[in-house]
Regions:
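Beta-propeller domains
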Residues: 56-79
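Secretory targeting and sorting signals
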Residues: 1-21
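A short beta-strand motif characteristic of beta-propeller blades
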Residues: 30-37, 72-79, 125-131, 166-172, ...
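Beta-rich, blade/repeat-based domains predominating
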Residues: 36-53, 80-105, 111-116, 131-149, ...
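Short loop/turn segments that connect beta-strands within beta-propeller blades
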Residues: 67-72, 120-125, 161-166, 204-209, ...
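A short loop-to-beta-strand structural motif that recurs across blades of beta-propeller domains
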Residues: 63-66, 115-118, 157-160, 199-201, ...
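Glycine/small-residue-rich hydrophobic helix-like segments
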Residues: 198-261
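N-terminal low-complexity, Pro/Thr/Ser-rich intrinsically disordered segments
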Residues: 19-35
Length: 301
């Protein structure tokens, strides 16, 4: 969420004082475990490769970092050519898509369309521009056919990018769509709604004009600022509540519980991959505090 740089100063004071409206998830509630840090960074995007290596982006410097395992140092591997670095997602050709152009222009993203995507060859660390002309690339995911979807939490337009580089900047309309994750069957694109009518929606790829809300927040949680989400192996959305400082799991429409707390400025969550490093089944959180935490209560074994 590009808003993180604006929220971070206030959130660290406010979030610990709030009382959650949601119960702790069964078997969860353990303290988060610090597993990595990028000093001075505001971490925005995250992805894990098949070998368990974690990649993350810095909204401020535009750099992409790699951590080979929990506890390992963050190694800068690339810098985007314009603006802050945003979302990450794996392309069908094995390259890592890197969203960029995440700066003040996103406030007028639907008009200016500053959002762009580059491709990172993770074997050589060569970053090559791919497409531009999106409202933003704050959230990003790729379907099995290679089509990518990109969101802007300060706009209304969700873009679609075809494998050949064609861009459809206004594929769908949903105010303040944030994050992006496709269901296992590519039927739905799941997004958080951060600032406008906060909650979580899913958008049918076959009918993008008919988004379905699966969570509408109310009361104090209306100000929780849900951010970049993931899906567990059962297809349940796992959502960081940025201002709340909590990680939520949505068990059914309208019903959510708390996996972890005490994590203000959380920007995104991701499940690990592979058998080593940031391994499969383990849930990790990044944030605008530059820290990476494991969420033990979110283990998906």
């Amino acid at each position: 969420m590009a808003a993180g740089a604006l929220l971070a100063g206030a959130v660290s004071v406010v979030a610990p004082q709030t009382v959650s409206a949601a119960p702790v998830c069964p078997g969860a509630g353990q303290a988060p475990v610090l597993v990595g840090r990028v000093p001075g960074a505001a971490l925005e995007g995250v992805a894990v490769d098949g070998g368990g290596r974690l990649y993350t982006t810095d909204l401020l410097s535009g750099r992409v970092f790699r951590l080979d395992a929990p506890g390992a140092p963050a190694v800068p591997v690339a810098t985007v050519p314009d603006g802050g670095a945003g979302a990450l997602a794996w392309a069908s050709d094995g390259s890592l898509l890197v969203g960029y152009g995440a700066d003040a222009r996103v406030f007028l993203g639907d008009i200016l369309r500053p959002g762009a995507i580059a491709k990172l060859n993770t074997a050589t660390n060569v970053l090559s521009p791919f497409v531009s002309g999106l409202s933003a690339a704050n959230g990003l995911d790729v379907a099995a056919d290679g089509t990518a979807y990109a969101t802007n939490d300060f706009g209304t337009q969700i873009g679609r990018v075809f494998p050949d580089g064609r861009v459809e900047p206004h594929w769908a309309t949903l105010p303040s769509a944030n994050g992006a994750v496709l269901g296992a069957d590519d039927r739905y694109l799941y997004v958080s709604r951060t600032f406008v009518n906060p909650g979580v929606s899913r958008i049918p790829l076959a009918n993008p004009g008919a988004p379905e809300s699966i969570l509408d927040l109310a009361g104090l949680d209306n100000f929780a600022a849900p951010d970049g989400l993931a899906l567990d192996s059962r297809g349940r959305p796992v959502v960081p509540a940025n201002v709340r400082g909590e990680i939520w799991r949505l068990d059914s429409p309208g019903q959510y519980c708390v996996l972890a707390s005490g994590l203000p400025t959380s920007s995104m969550v991701v499940y690990g991959q592979g058998s080593g490093g940031f391994s499969a089944g383990r849930l990790f959180r990044i944030g605008f505090d530059g820290a990476i935490y494991e969420i033990p209560g979110g283990f998906d074994g």
